[in-house]
């Protein structure tokens, strides 16, 4: 009878090599992590991201004036605006190098969801430094609901793994919808255990 190799369930923190966080825009957007940008409709979430995307694409500066360095690639996935009549003109007005900004064409590839393997494939092929999903609600899929914490955690774990493995920052834009049935504090989070 062969000796069984016993797997340890626990890992000691003393066995972990500490590393530092790499920032795309300190202290707001970390590389290898998910960032949630949320606010009320009309607060300028998408506009702020368009400006950041433009600066990244041309190697400009972060909103606080720090140099980006080398121009970076970005995937900007937006379901709320037209690509040719709204998104591209906005990018151009912001001064983006549109050769460094891409999207998954939803006319060709319909039914895109947050845990869709096509997002991972696009990240592998394009190697962006930043991926923006705008808004997160449009990419949940019919069987997902951010109000159910377990489902939301599963989606976030997968996206977080992709961000870490492929060394990119992922920003999820979330528009708040305050409901009269919940307090302001719980309405903001959008995710609750049921």
Predicted regions and their residues:
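Phosphate-binding/switch region of NTP-binding enzymes
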Residues: 36, 42, 46-47, 77, ...
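Gly/Ala-rich phosphate-binding loop of Rossmann-like dinucleotide-binding domains
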Residues: 57
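Hydrophobic positions on the alpha1 helix immediately C-terminal to the Walker A/P-loop
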Residues: 48, 52
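Conserved inter-motif catalytic segment of the P-loop NTP-binding fold
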Residues: 3-4, 10-13, 19-20, 24-26, ...
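Residue-level detector of intrinsically disordered, flexible termini
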Residues: 1, 121, 184-186
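Short, functionally important structural connectors and interaction interfaces within domains
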Residues: 16-17, 21, 183, 187
